[in-house]
């Protein structure tokens, strides 16, 4: 997932909730991403109100896509270093993932995903199927991720891929058979949740045909 631009924090007010009142938000850290603390009163099952606090990490919103070559039954992955994974039990931090990225301010998810696909895996994809927009870690992160699928072939190849040089991205593009990718999930070689989710969607779609 490209981290090319600092995303705009989510400053808009939260929607109404009859079980939450006096919601106040303070910024704890405003660096590349934004860390905030929300304090609020939360209605308890007995009708009483309890003051609570939660911290939320704001990194903008993102998009991810699975590109499938239906003729050869292959998909495109990228391998990149993920420091947080390396700090939490992953042996070397080098994760295999589907191409993904953050949305620029005011940018729609489809436009962002097309850009990321060309930068990361080197394919210009005009037609993407939008599946869902999901919160991946709603207990601590504000980000939601929009999921896409599409097809690729030799005709869609437009450049080398591997990430944007001016953003110091260093990605290895990896093409694998769908069956092998699923075996890699079972062996613990693919441990990225968004990648597993879209692989499952592809496999289920093939079963239904």
Language-model-detected regions and their locations in the chain:
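Nudix hydrolase/Nudix homology domain
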Residues: 2-24, 79, 91-94, 105, ...
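Conserved Nudix-box catalytic region and its N-terminal flanking loop in Nudix hydrolases
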Residues: 2-6, 54-57, 71-115, 157, ...
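Short, charged, low-hydrophobicity "junction" segments
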Residues: 5-16, 49-52, 120-122, 126
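Acidic, metal-coordinating catalytic segment for phosphate/diphosphate chemistry
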Residues: 28-72, 86
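Short loop segments at secondary-structure junctions
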Residues: 43-44, 69-72, 81, 151-155, ...
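Unchanged
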Residues: 52, 61-64, 99-191
């Amino acid at each position: 997932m490209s981290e090319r631009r600092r995303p705009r924090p989510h400053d808009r007010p939260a929607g109404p909730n009859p079980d939450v009142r006096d919601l106040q938000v303070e910024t704890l850290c405003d660096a590349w991403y934004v860390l905030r603390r929300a304090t609020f009163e939360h209605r308890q099952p007995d009708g009483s109100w309890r003051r609570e606090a939660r911290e939320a990490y704001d990194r903008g919103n993102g998009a991810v896509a699975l590109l499938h070559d239906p003729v050869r039954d292959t998909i495109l992955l990228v391998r990149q270093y993920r420091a947080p994974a390396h700090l939490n039990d992953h042996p070397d931090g080098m994760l295999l993932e589907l191409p993904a990225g953050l949305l620029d301010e005011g940018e729609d998810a489809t436009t962002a995903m097309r850009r990321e696909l060309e930068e990361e895996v080197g394919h210009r994809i005009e037609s993407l199927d939008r599946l869902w927009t999901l919160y991946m870690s709603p207990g601590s992160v504000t980000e939601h991720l929009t999921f896409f699928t599409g097809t690729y072939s030799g005709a869609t190849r437009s450049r080398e891929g591997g990430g944007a040089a001016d953003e110091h991205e260093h990605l290895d593009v990896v093409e694998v058979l769908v069956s092998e990718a699923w075996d890699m999930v079972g062996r613990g070689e693919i441990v990225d949740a968004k990648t597993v989710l879209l692989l499952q969607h592809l496999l289920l779609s093939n079963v239904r045909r």
